[in-house]
Curated annotation (Swiss-Prot):
Organism domain of life: Eukaryota
Function: Component of the THO subcomplex of the TREX complex which is thought to couple mRNA transcription, processing and nuclear export, and which specifically associates with spliced mRNA and not with unspliced pre-mRNA. Required for efficient export of polyadenylated RNA and spliced mRNA. The THOC1-THOC2-THOC3 core complex alone is sufficient to bind export factor NXF1-NXT1 and promote ATPase activity of DDX39B; in the complex THOC2 is the only component that directly interacts with DDX39B.
Annotated region (Disordered), positions in chain: 1182-1586
Residues in the signal sequence: none
Protein name listed in UniProt: THO complex subunit 2
Gene: THOC2
Organism: Dasypus novemcinctus (Nine-banded armadillo)
A single GO cellular-component term on record: THO complex part of transcription export complex
Subunit description: Component of the THO subcomplex, which is composed of THOC1, THOC2, THOC3, THOC5, THOC6 and THOC7. The THO subcomplex interacts with DDX39B to form the THO-DDX39B complex which multimerizes into a 28-subunit tetrameric assembly. Component of the transcription/export (TREX) complex at least composed of ALYREF/THOC4, DDX39B, SARNP/CIP29, CHTOP and the THO subcomplex; in the complex interacts with THOC1, THOC3, THOC5, THOC7 and DDX39B. TREX seems to have a dynamic structure involving ATP-dependent remodeling. Interacts with POLDIP3 and ZC3H11A.
Length: 1613
């Protein structure tokens, strides 16, 4: 009772008589108005009486006063005596505790005074016996206590109710009979309850025992639930609520003995009582065993045991005894599982589930570990049954397959059971929740598994329909989320626990295939990586699966694919993720498993194939795996194996490709190109489109035909049966819109590989990644072009300007993607036009085709303008640019040979079929029909292509006049053509390489205005170093193919005069004088004749050799690899000249030796090429057979000119080309090595006659010109006599200080002899011979064959001069050439945009030139050739830009003075350098080999150059001087011509070599004055040309020297 506030104030007691008594009465009257016992007023009333009594005990108020007022108050309440007795009881206890006797006395007096108010009986109940004794109400308190004990014992401990059945068997028998009677009639629980009450009263039965008997009968009669529940509800209203729960708990405890087993009937009764809330679950739960902590411990123990099993299974077993031990352990574990202990909580749970009390069942499961309850089969089956009942109506409506009856499930009669689901929304109420508690143990009920999957499938169909409203869409999305959760937590784990149920797997795939692959793969990821770690059973299953997989994979071979495949299939039905993960790990280690594994996967289900795709992607994306090998230069073998496996498995089996393709796209977005290997393999295997650089020429030719020819002859492998697989790949790309994105990503990634990944990775790897990216783009684009319909392709590929400008696609890739679209467009337009007028003539068809081309290509011509700056279109027209990029080899030529080859193969095949006696007739007939059909297809395709090519050629014929504009020089036009068209496309693919070569030929054949074929070929061949160096491995292969095709054309023209005259003779592409635009090449004198063309071809071969040797000598990996690849590709047509081939052979041999241990891949390439080169050696020819060194008379006069200004001298074979080479060596030793290897290279040009270079028309040159040329010829002869030794002369390589490099291995004796010869003055006899030579020259000029010089004695004198003076002369001459031709650009190489002058040349270029001056065995002749070119070129400049020439005598005097001074300087410097030579000879004595004089002589004889001594051995040693002099005296006139020409050039070269940078200003000025005098006749000829090309030629000749080379060749000394 709460503490009451003070009710009676002390003032009332003090003034009791006056006012206090009245106030107290008034208070009590108010408090007595509420008669209840629970109100606060009742407590206040008690407090008021207590305080009044307490004042009496304290002595503040007399007891009489108090008794009087209490008497008055008694009238207010009837229960006044009881209240007052309670107050006295409290005061009795308080006063007993006090030691003050007075207070006790006052209390006794008060009670005595109030005895008339409270009865004695009430006081005896409330007060203490001792107090009662003091009041006199009892005699003795002791006797009272004894009597009270006796009464209580009689009342409470003496049995009055019968508890045991045997004590009152009649009563209990009647009770049982009452409860066990037939209850089907009108008997109600109320009637039975009245009878029970009567029996209890009559037979004194214990009510608790009666309740127990009722429960026992209820257990035995479960069918009368309603009756007994009603009876118990009525009965319990008379008992305490806890009684029923305690009785039930006592019953459960009875069965908790060690071997006790609780009956299911008891569980059921308890469950029913719980369902109807007659007992509380928490009250009953404490009576059940085992305890919760025991359950948790058991769960943990199961997990530990599962992990131990995993550990044991993964251990390496070496002996059979251990296997036996393992089997025994398995048996023991099975025995343990067979004897589960009695778990009353689970028994009650099962009962609750059976009656449908889901709420209480859920409460019990919540107190246990996850899935612990469901892990017991009975509980799992009970949950499954409840779910069966709940989903029955919905399943009947949407899940039952058509035609199936099914077995209906009866609903529970219990109204409190969960409501059944009528629609998908109802599933959210209870069903999904039930599945979550069931977990992986749905495996116990496959039927329910199938039902749920079918319901899910129906839901997905409804979800994917477009008719649903937005509100319904939100609800269905929630259901979808729940369905995915159920799939993750229940369906997939349950499948893992099922025993190889393929039907369930297929059923599940029926639902899974409606999910997008993102959902599927997320589910597979959860299944593989998390599910197996969450349940002890699944942990064991995972270990067992891996163990079994190991067993199968160890025994898998090609021979036992079928039985092993069946085992793999069986294992995969339940646990595909674990199995495939292990199989893929094995494939990554052992690539020889790929084929047997692929073959063994044919027994998988559809779901398993999809899981396999996911596992492959996960394996590819494994972040722990390195994608590169340890050397960081090659892609890891595991990735290559996976890629190969991907291609094979996706082709063979119907697996969804969307995920894999999206993965590759995502990797490309992230800038990672490694995984393109996957796409490459998939496209190759599925579509049969093979990308390889190892294609034969036959295959390449077949690839230029139609689709049928490509399939038959264009690939290495068998490309049949790809129709279905390529269709699947196409569908996957189109359905997920990945076709164009993948193309664009690959095109962009090509540059990304270089600029984003290039710095981090090894150059070799970057090249491989670039090639892989490019090849995959080509392959993928080819697949789209051949498989997509016209509509699909056009719909997806944007226009060319959008591709390039918006998507930043490189131009070559953009045109590659757009090309099929143009072809489709043109073809469809053409078909439309044909249909409009049927039966028209061929001419009309061509016209229609051209019309359709114009309609399609006109927008393209406009679009391409934005791709380049406007300046570009001054050189080439957009139409030409678009035409080049839009055509293919299919459009240009028909591969008749390929068609014929494939048709012949089919005929042979048909014959073999006829001859095969073992083949059944039906099969024979089928095969023959197939071959015949294929043959007809090929012939029809060939015919179709022929018609198409004819139409295309007609179109090109009409367009060609508008292709190239006359706004700029030919050189600029060719530059843009090569830069924007040829070079980007020739390295795009092997077919494009062939296309580029054939297109150049076609443009030539079409006689395209303003196109110089000669210039184009020269630019291609002149300097390939930079192009080769910048290529990747595959690009080098394609570039090699391009060069091979170009060389093939050139070789065809070179090999036969008739062919040359027919295909080039009258063509504007071979003009040597570039006239106005309208010129048609009709003037024969302006054409390059056959012999001079052969000289040009030799020059190109020399250029190729020089570039090749340079690349081989750099030591750079990419240079060496690429040039070897290029050389291998062009081997059929190069080298053709013996000495060039020998030079290459020596250099390649050296590479083989150097790289054997260092770089094995280069060694293999070099060895391969070396072997092939040796096999080609018998087909090589000497230089004099390759081109005629004696030029024809007519063309000796014919001039070659590049405009009114005349071109400067071309030194493309001599010094200018050398200044172009970047062959800088780091040490003197490396320079000497370069000498040995490149000697043969310069020999190529040594025997090449040089053409005269005049500025007049065909044969009518001015007299001044002739005289000038005559003077030059004499000078050459003199200088050659003085400076060329009788044996093979050598131009020394300049060192860094500008001095000559000494001959390393030349004996001292030779050097001394040489010095004495240099000091020998001219004899009288030699002077006489010189005069004779002048007369002979005059006669020759009169007969219109200028520049043919005779042998003279002065030549012998000049031969004695050292080669150093030739270098000086060449250096001075080249400088004069620059000064004399300032108004025109000095000719240079293809690659360099700057003028190639010796004066303006940077130090680096000078070093290059110095190294190149002495690299060849035939260097002397090379130097001569270069100087002749320089001399003649400068002569042309003189004709155009200088006053009339001086007299011949003055000119000769000037030459003599210059040469005398040069000789004096050379003698002085030679003394200084002699010491250096001797020292260097020792350092480099091992680098050069000596060649005996006999061998030197033999080589000279083979090349027809004995008189000139052009072939120089590798050794610096010269042949005996005397022998060579004698031979020279007996030489023929033609030999003399060559020799004088070469000696002059050699002399000039020696002057450059010896003089170097230290040449005095005085010498320079003198020679410059001489050059100005020589060029006196040039300006007179300017008038002859109607158009001005001076400025244009300046630009042109900065980067090109071909025309000048032609001029040099056409005028042979």
């Amino acid at each position: 009772m709460a503490a009451a506030t003070v009710v009676v104030p002390a003032e009332w007691i003090k003034n009791w008589e006056k006012s206090g008594r009245g106030e107290f009465l008034h208070l009590c009257r108010i408090l007595s108005e509420n008669k209840g016992h629970d109100s606060s007023t009742y407590r206040d009333f008690q407090q008021a009486l207590y305080e009044l009594s307490y004042h009496v005990i304290k002595g503040n108020l007399k007891h009489e006063q108090a008794s009087n007022v209490l008497n008055d108050i008694s009238e207010f309440r009837e229960d006044m005596p009881s209240i007052l007795a309670d107050v006295f009881c409290i005061l009795d206890i308080e006063t007993n505790c006090l030691e003050e006797k007075s207070k006790r006395d006052y209390f006794t007096q008060l009670v005595l005074a109030c005895l008339y108010l409270v009865s004695d009986t009430v006081l005896k109940e409330r007060l203490d016996p001792e107090t009662l004794e003091s009041l006199g109400l009892i005699k003795q308190s002791q006797q009272f206590n004894q009597k009270s004990v006796k009464i209580k014992t009689k009342l409470f401990y003496k049995q009055q109710k019968f508890n045991l059945l045997r004590e009152e068997n009649e009563g209990y028998a009647k009770l049982i009979a009452e409860l066990g009677q037939d209850l089907s009639g009108n008997i109600t629980s109320d009637l039975i309850l009245e009878n029970i009450k009567s029996l209890i009263g009559c037979f004194n039965l214990d009510p608790n025992r009666v309740l127990d008997v009722i429960l026992e009968v209820f257990e035995c009669r479960p069918e009368h639930d309603d009756f007994f529940i009603s009876l118990l509800e009525s009965y319990m209203s008379m008992c305490e609520p806890q009684t029923l729960c305690h009785i039930l708990g006592f019953k459960f405890k009875f069965y908790q003995e060690p071997n006790g087993e609780t009956p299911s009937s008891l569980y059921r009764v308890a469950a029913v009582l719980l369902q109807f809330n007659l007992i509380d679950l928490d009250d009953l739960y404490v009576h059940l065993l085992p305890a919760d902590n025991s359950i948790m411990d058991e769960h943990k123990r199961e997990i530990v045991e599962a992990k131990q099993i995993v550990r044991k299974l993964t251990m390496v077993v070496l002996s059979s005894e251990k296997i036996d031990e393992r089997e025994k352990e398995k048996e023991k574990e099975e025995e343990k599982v067979e004897k589960p202990p009695d778990n009353q909580k689970l028994g009650l749970l099962e009962a609750l589930l059976k009656i449908g009390d889901w709420q209480h069942a859920q409460n019990i499961m919540d107190q246990m570990p996850p899935y612990y309850a469901a892990s017991h089969k009975l509980i799992a089956l009970a949950i499954c049954k409840l779910i069966h009942i709940t989903i029955e109506p919905l399943y009947r409506r949407v899940g039952v397959p058509k035609g199936a009856k099914g077995s209906p499930v009866n609903a529970l009669q219990n109204k409190r059971a969960p409501k059944q689901a009528e629609n998908f929304e109802d599933l959210r109420r209870d069903v999904f929740n039930m599945f979550c508690y069931l977990g992986p143990h749905l495996s116990h009920d496959p039927i329910l598994f199938a039902k749920v999957v079918r319901i899910g499938k129906s839901f997905m169909k409804e979800f994917q329909s477009d008719g649903s409203k937005s509100e319904d869409k939100e609800k269905t999305e929630v259901i979808l989320s729940c369905l995915l959760s159920i799939t993750d937590q229940v369906l997939l784990p349950s499948l893992s626990l099922m025993d190889c149920n393929a039907c369930m797997s297929e059923e599940l795939w029926g639902m899974f295939k409606t999910f997008p692959y993102q959902h599927r793969y997320r589910l597979y990821g959860q299944w593989k990586n998390e599910t197996y770690n969450s349940h002890p059973l699944l942990v064991k299953v995972k270990a067992q699966t891996i163990d079994r997989a190991k067993y199968i994979m160890k025994r898998l071979t090609k021979e036992n694919v079928k039985p092993s495949g069946r085992q793999i299939g069986k294992l995969s039905h339940s646990n595909p993720t674990i199995l495939f993960d292990y199989i893929l790990s094995q494939i990554q280690k052992y690539d020889n498993l790929i084929t047997p594994v692929v073959d063994s996967l044919k027994y998988l289900t559809s779901l398993n194939y999809d899981v396999l795709a996911y596992c492959i992607i996960e394996a590819l994306a494994n972040p722990e795996k390195e994608r590169m090998k340890h050397d960081d230069t090659t892609i890891s073998s595991w990735l290559q194996s996976l890629a190969s496996f991907c291609g094979a498995v996706f082709r063979k089996y119907p697996i969804d490709l969307a995920g894999l393709l999206q993965y590759v796209a995502n990797q490309l977005k992230a800038g990672k190109s490694f995984d393109l290997l996957i796409l490459k393999e998939v496209v190759q295997k599925m579509a049969g489109i093979e990308i390889t650089e190892e294609m034969t020429m036959e295959q390449l030719e077949a690839m230029t035909g139609g689709e049928q020819l490509k399939a038959e002859g264009g690939y290495f492998g068998q490309i049949r049966n790809t129709k279905k697989s390529s269709q699947r790949l196409k569908d996957a790309l189109l359905d997920h819109d990945l076709a164009l994105p993948l193309c664009l990503l690959m095109a962009q990634q090509r540059n990304g590989v270089i600029f984003q990944e290039g710095g981090e990775k090894h150059l070799k790897l970057v090249g491989k990644l670039y090639d892989q990216c490019h090849d995959t783009l080509v392959q993928f684009g080819g697949f789209l072009a051949s498989n997509l319909s016209t509509e699909d392709y056009i719909k997806r590929v944007p226009s060319i300007d959008v591709l390039c400008n918006e998507f930043h696609t490189p131009h070559d890739a953009a045109f590659f993607l757009s090309r099929p679209m143009y072809a489709h467009h043109i073809s469809s337009k053409y078909d439309e036009l044909k249909k409009s007028e049927k039966g028209s003539k061929q001419q009309h068809k061509v016209h229609k085709y051209i019309t359709s081309c114009e309609m399609v290509m006109a927008p393209v011509h406009e679009a391409v303008v934005s791709l380049h700056v406007s300046k570009v279109w001054d050189d080439i027209s957009p139409q030409f640019y678009a035409t080049f990029w839009s055509l293919t080899m299919y459009d240009l030529a028909v591969p008749h040979t390929s068609y014929e080859r494939e048709v012949n193969k089919l005929k042979i095949q048909m014959k073999a079929i006829d001859d095969n006696q073992e083949m059944p007739p039906n099969k024979k007939k089928k095969e023959k029909e197939r071959c015949t059909a294929l043959q007809d297809k090929l012939l029809e395709e060939e015919k179709k292509q022929m018609e198409h090519v004819q139409r295309v050629l007609q179109r090109l014929k009409l367009e060609k006049d508008n292709w190239l504009l006359a706004k700029s020089t030919k050189n600029e036009t060719i530059t843009k053509f090569l830069q924007l068209c040829i070079f980007p496309r020739c390295i795009f693919s092997a077919i494009d390489a062939v296309y580029c070569a054939r297109f150049v030929e076609l443009v030539h054949q079409q006689k395209t205005p303003n196109f110089s074929t000669l210039l184009c070929y020269d630019r291609v061949f002149s300097d390939i170093i930079y192009t080769v160096a910048s290529c990747t491995e595959n690009e080098a292969s394609r570039y090699g193919r391009f060069l091979c095709c170009m060389l093939e054309t050139v070789t065809r023209w070179h090999s036969d005069r008739a062919t040359y005259e027919k295909e080039c003779g009258n063509y504007p592409g071979f003009l040597t004088i570039l006239r106005a635009t309208g010129f048609d090449g009709g003037n024969k004198a302006d054409q390059l004749d056959y012999e001079n063309f052969r000289h040009v071809v030799h020059k190109w071969h020399y250029k190729l050799t020089k570039a090749s040797v340079h690349c081989l000598e750099t030591g750079e990996y990419t240079h060496i690899r690429n040039i070897l690849i290029v050389l291998t590709k062009i081997l059929p047509w190069y080298p053709k000249v013996l000495n060039l081939g020998q030079a290459l052979e020596r250099r390649v041999h050296k590479i083989c030796q150097e790289e054997k241990e260092k770089r094995p891949d280069l060694y293999a390439l070099a060895m391969g090429y070396s072997g092939q080169l040796k096999s080609r050696k018998p087909y090589m020819i000497p230089e004099n057979e390759f081109h005629n060194k004696d030029p024809p008379p007519r063309n000796a006069v014919a001039s070659v000119q590049n405009g009114p200004g005349g071109g400067p001298s071309s030194s493309s074979i001599g010094s200018a080309s050398k200044s172009d080479e970047s062959s800088t060596e780091e040490t003197d030793k490396s320079r000497e090595r370069s000498q040995c290897s490149v000697k043969a290279v310069n020999k190529a040009s040594s025997a090449t006659p040089k053409g005269n270079s005049s500025n007049g028309n065909s044969g009518s040159n001015s007299k001044a010109v002739k005289e000038n040329e005559k003077e030059k010829g004499k000078e050459k002869e003199k200088e050659k006599k003085e400076k060329t030794p009788a044996t093979t002369p050598e131009a020394r390589v300049l060192g860094k200080d500008g001095k000559e490099k000494p001959k390393e291995e030349r004996p001292n004796k030779d050097e001394k002899a040489r010095e004495t010869k240099e000091r020998t003055p001219k004899s009288d006899k030699e002077k006489e011979k010189f005069k004779k030579e002048e007369k002979a020259k005059d006669e020759k000029f009169k007969t219109a064959i200028p520049n043919v010089e005779s042998k003279s004695t002065q030549e012998k004198e000049r031969e004695k001069e050292p080669s150093r003076e030739r270098d000086i002369a060449k250096d001075m001459k080249s400088k004069e050439n620059v000064k004399g031709g300032e108004k025109t650009a000095v000719s240079g190489s293809l690659k360099s945009p700057v003028p190639r002058s010796d004066i303006a040349e940077p130090e680096r270029e000078q070093k290059r030139r110095k190294i190149d001056t002495h690299p060849s065995p035939s260097h002397s002749s090379t130097v001569k050739d270069s100087l002749i070119e320089l001399k003649e070129s400068s002569a042309k400049l003189y004709i155009n830009h200088t006053p009339p020439p001086l007299s011949k005598s003055k000119e000769r005097e000037m030459d003599k003075k210059d040469l005398d001074k040069s000789r004096e300087r050379s003698r002085e410097r030679e003394k200084k350098d002699e010491k250096d030579r001797k020292e260097r000879k020792r350092d480099h004595s091992n680098n050069d080999r000596e060649v005996p004089p006999d061998l030197t002589k033999r080589r000279k004889e083979e090349n027809g150059t004995m008189g000139v001594s052009k072939h120089k051995s590798e050794s610096p040693c010269e042949s005996p001087y005397a022998n060579e002099k004698d031979k020279e005296k007996n030489k023929s006139k033609s030999s003399g011509k060559e020799k004088s020409s070469d000696s002059f050039k050699s002399e000039k070269m020696d002057k450059i070599s010896s003089g170097g940078k230290k040449e005095s200003r005085h010498d320079k000025e003198k020679i410059e004055k001489k050059e100005k005098r020589d060029s006196s006749g040039g300006k007179e000829e300017k008038k002859q040309y109607p158009f001005h090309l001076n400025n244009a030629l300046n630009q042109c000749m900065e980067s090109f020297d071909a025309d000048n080379v032609l001029k040099v060749y056409s005028s042979v000394v």
